[in-house]
Design a protein with these regions (language model features):
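Domain-level signature for proteins that mediate thiol-based redox and metal-cofactor handling
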Residues: 1-115
Length: 115
């Protein structure tokens, strides 16, 4: 009798996704995009389709495509079974330093940033 191996896909939690996104560093500010407060919303369905709403420091950020590629790369490395990764930017609430996490502000202060 032949048995087939069934691969079970475990959908990552929002926390696991955020943890993976901490590997994505902003190329200009020495912090990751999670601690910078760039991630506004994460949705994932049971089929493995992921949708992220994010922001950047400005709506004309020259590093947007680099950050998108880095996000997709980090998520595909950690969760190769994800089917679709959609990243949209929302600039309706302009980013400012208030969005930086407490941990992020501490790291920046250690590096000499006045924040």
């Amino acid at each position: 009798m032949k048995t087939s191996k069934v691969e079970v896909m475990e959908i990552p939690t929002e926390l696991e996704i955020l943890e993976a996104l901490k590997s994505v560093k902003d190329p200009e500010i020495p912090l990751d995009i999670v601690n910078l407060g760039f991630i506004r919303e994460i949705k994932i369905d049971k089929e493995g389709n992921l949708s992220i709403i994010a922001t950047l420091t400005t709506n004309d950020c020259p590093m947007e495509s680099y950050i998108v590629k880095s996000i997709v790369g980090a998520l595909k490395d950690k969760f190769p079974f994800l089917k679709e990764i959609s990243i949209k930017f929302d600039f309706s609430i302009p980013w400012n330093t208030d969005f930086i996490s407490k941990e992020g502000k501490e790291k920046l202060r250690e590096l000499g940033w006045k924040i």
